[in-house]
Amino acid sequence: MAEEAQYEYLVPLEKYLSAGVRLGTRLSNKYLEERGFIYAVRPDGLRIFDIKKIDERLRIAAKLIARYPPDRVLVHTTRPYGFKPVQMFCKFVGCKALTGRFIPGMLTNPNLSNYLEVDLLFVVDPRLDSQAVAEAAKMGIPVVALVDTDTPHQYIDFMIPCNNKGRKSLALIFWVLARQVLRERGELKPDQDLPVPPEEFETRLVQT
């Protein structure tokens, strides 16, 4: 417990909690359980992630992403709540953003007009973004992914366990990652923040 109390999170623990980053689903991937990512199960069956492990994986992911030329990293999501976070992340970090439909062949068919040459693929949800993941695996492109408690882990080279469905969770995750990648590159000082708060990464709900 003393060691846990001394651990310094990338953002205050309260921020992670209020954004719901640790909230999983009622379904569970045994592989994630074996890796120790799932901390507890609530009485209603909802799985809860270990926030310390989320934080640790974000640190490692930032180091990994920072090693690649930004224009050789593709960040993809088909989840609407992920559009704004991905676009903002790529704006600050310089990666390629692909939101919405992934056209088959974009990573495997050089004859396509929208063919992309990338060295690293980062997806928000391997289940929804399965076409991109499958093509990356076929081409030998490493895959980083946000994974929920029920996410399939096949072809994922590096997993970041978290709530990959929530609006606030995705905003905070990508804000933290963007800041940490820039710190790893030396473009931000170790104690320096992005010029915008996490809320600017959040998808806005439109009233109809």
Swiss-Prot record:
One of its GO terms (cellular component) is small ribosomal subunit. One of its GO terms (biological process) is translation. SUPFAM superfamilies: Ribosomal protein S2 (SSF52313). GO terms for molecular function: structural constituent of ribosome. This is Small ribosomal subunit protein uS2. Belongs to the universal ribosomal protein uS2 family. It holds the Pfam family Ribosomal_S2. It comes from Pyrobaculum calidifontis (strain DSM 21063 / JCM 11548 / VA1). InterPro entries: Ribosomal_uS2 (IPR001865), Ribosomal_uS2_arc (IPR023454), Ribosomal_uS2_euk/arc (IPR005707), Ribosomal_uS2_flav_dom_sf (IPR023591). Keywords: Ribonucleoprotein, Ribosomal protein.
